[in-house]
Amino acid sequence: DEQEALAGLDIEPGCWRDPKARVTALTFKRFSRRLVELTGEPWIGWELGASMPLSSHGFLGYAAMSSNTLGDAIELAVKFFRTRGTIVQLEAFVEGEWAVLQLNEMLSLGEHGPLLTESLFSSFHFMGLQLMPDIEILGELRFAYPEPAYFSRLRPMIPVPIYFDCAYSQMRFPAER
């Protein structure tokens, strides 16, 4: 129930659909804690990310949809990611044979970091499928936190290798794509 999830928080109902809406880090922490408590699903970040189509990101999403290549869309996302939020920074670079999308926390999110990281990675994955529906899924995921207890239930659904306790949270895929 949206009303119950937002009760007492400085968040307007329906703001998730507004590309201009902003949420402070403190409000995000309170909301993420409540979301997990209400759903009983600590992996809710994966579902949240999957529910955000490109169009939910306003002009940035539409610009990505009009990009000629996935590389162009990623370049736009990195360049303008800060217009969507300031809690994390998105960085893209090539490392050997890998193209890397890296999330850098701009302030410590502690126990709430996994929810944000997982929702962003899920969102990026499904937006990539919107842009290139026929692409084979190759790559790996790296997370800068220990493996959560709930992850053993998710692992079979994720078609790429997954690593925890890494230096950074990254999505990696073959650079030639």
Where do the language-model regions lie?
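Alpha-helical bundle regulatory/interaction domains
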Residues: 67-177
